């Protein structure tokens, strides 16, 4: 149900962006068991400037993002989710922030100039609390570490290996880049609750996962090697 909305949104984005950029799209299907891959092929498979990638199994959103980055043939690569929780037009402000000394620009709804719309209070509290902990560990002091809406320098991220599945892997990507010396900046952004579908995030499991990742990244920082 999200794909027709995504197609219409990306058509508008391409029209807005093509005056400044050579826009190309990579669509990654993360081993779906429904008709997602067929619909993606129908909508985008034959379009100029579009590439489709299918993962053999569901490996999590971070693995899907990395697959898309590796499949891209440009040095600047942007990642968005298919239900457009963030407005892709915000990339017009984010892409110029990827200057020569920056390896990643992440959307930041928890930035003082950012905004969240219709997001449950428990999710806000959880996300801000986790950001506080990551801020104490990592070199790049950010307000938001959990957004998957980002702009990457391909050469800085394509060799990153993640071990976590789900959205936890998105944080692991950022953490591993941070501990490898990458400079990461954030752009104030507007976050809305998922427009299509229901979030499957389980609070207790999410907290345990983040605490485990924080522990491993702490060991990595102390020991100076992967954990």
For the regions a protein language model found, what residue spans apply to each?
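Acidic helix N-cap motif at the loop->helix transition within catalytic regions
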Residues: 1-5, 34-42
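Short, well-formed alpha-helical segments that are part of the catalytic scaffolds
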Residues: 1-15
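Terminal low-complexity segments of carbohydrate-biosynthetic enzymes
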Residues: 5-8, 21, 39, 212-227
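Catalytic donor-sugar/metal-binding loop of nucleotide-sugar-dependent glycosyltransferases
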Residues: 140-141, 162-165, 174-192
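Acceptor/aglycone-binding surface of glycosyltransferases and processive sugar-polymer synthases
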Residues: 51-71, 76, 88-167, 193-204, ...
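A conserved acidic beta->alpha catalytic loop
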Residues: 29-38, 84
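Short beta-strand/loop segment that forms part of the nucleotide-sugar
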Residues: 14, 18-31, 53-55
